[in-house]
Amino acid sequence: MAGTSRNVRVLVTGANGFVGSHIVSLLLSRGYVVNATVRRQTASEKLIATFACDRLHVFVIPDLTSEQALDEAIRGCKYVVHVASTVPSKEQASGIDIDSAISSIESVMNSAVAHASEKVVLTSSMSTHLDVKAPILNESTWYTPDRSSTKLMVQYMSSKTLVERRAWELSSTLKLPLTTVAPVYIGGPTIIHEQDPKSSVSNQDLLRCIEDESRSRIPGWIDVRTVAHLHLHAIEDHSLNGRRILACTHNRGVVPMDCSLMNSLLAKDSAALIDFDRTKRDLLEQIDAFNSGQTRRVVA
């Protein structure tokens, strides 16, 4: 795989995020050249310090929605992975700017066409598949967005759904291949230099779940490293063009999900499948190390 990836350039937006940084790490390990975008200079410095690789090129782009914002970063990129997005925390005061999120995917898709990129992979969310009337979630199910809601999680789910819908519209009109990866809650270690492993919103939920899983209503989990591998498959496997990969490896049975596409990919890539116990163990060990062993250990 690394042989075919040599000198192939990939754009990764949101490269300093929990998922984005793992995608960058995997791409670099496979020989790709990575053009990474971040919003702030401090994030750029941490990304460079983390990987220290001459095949990583970091671009500070505060606003992906601005016209031609990606022109320099996307130049020469065969593939584009659009990760940039955040899961809202309960402490977040302001709502989610849905229009900006839609403008960002429009900017990414239009720039990809303008610079002859061959494919876009979009990090979506299980919530985009969440049709409450469907007996099981699958590639064809969709959440019904509600832009009028003041609830932060509804805004998030609506935003992710409207962004993905817009991406598919543009994929069709621009004749640009698209694959989406839609994970459930994501857990695991962080890799950015000096980043607190508890800083990820998903990891905060995972820690609460570990402390008392019986009280958790979270539908399922997947390891962040497995999510990165699914993005790599989406880049490299052209049979996945036009597909929506629903990703959950630890389904708690709260919401029935058809993850057969994901399972078929992981069956070919056994190293990518990280079980839930390892996710918990690796996260807890990293938290202990980050806090110099002062954190109370939670035994799963």
Curated annotation (Swiss-Prot):
Pathway: Secondary metabolite biosynthesis
Disulfide bonds: none
Active site: K160 (proton donor)
UniProt superkingdom: Eukaryota
Gene induction: Expression is strongly induced under conditions of nitrogen starvation. Expression is positively regulated by the cluster-specific transcription factor rua1 that recognizes and binds to the specific 5'-T/G-G/T-C-G-C-A-T-A/T-C/T-C/T-G/A-3' upstream activating sequence found in all promoters of the UA biosynthesis genes.
EC class: oxidoreductase
Residues reported to bind NADP(+): 14-20, 39, 63-64, 83-85, 156, 160, 183-186, 199
GO molecular function: nucleotide binding; oxidoreductase activity, acting on the CH-OH group of donors, NAD or NADP as acceptor
EC code(s) of this entry: 1.-.-.-
InterPro entries tied to this protein: Epimerase_deHydtase, NAD(P)-bd_dom_sf, NAD(P)_dehydrat-like
Keyword terms: NADP, Nucleotide-binding, Oxidoreductase
Its job: Fatty acid hydroxylase; part of the gene cluster that mediates the biosynthesis of the glycolipid biosurfactant ustilagic acid (UA). UA is a secreted cellobiose glycolipid that is toxic for many microorganisms and confers biocontrol activity to U.maydis. UA consists of 15,16-dihydroxypalmitic or 2,15,16-trihydroxypalmitic acid, which is O-glycosidically linked to cellobiose at its terminal hydroxyl group. In addition, the cellobiose moiety is acetylated and acylated with a short-chain hydroxy fatty acid.
PANTHER family linked: NAD DEPENDENT EPIMERASE/DEHYDRATASE, STEROL-4-ALPHA-CARBOXYLATE 3-DEHYDROGENASE, DECARBOXYLATING
Family: Belongs to the NAD(P)-dependent epimerase/dehydratase family. Dihydroflavonol-4-reductase subfamily.
Name of the protein in its database record: Fatty acid hydroxylase uhd1
Upper classification of the organism: Eukaryota, Fungi, Dikarya, Basidiomycota, Ustilaginomycotina
Name of the gene encoding the protein in the UniProt record: uhd1
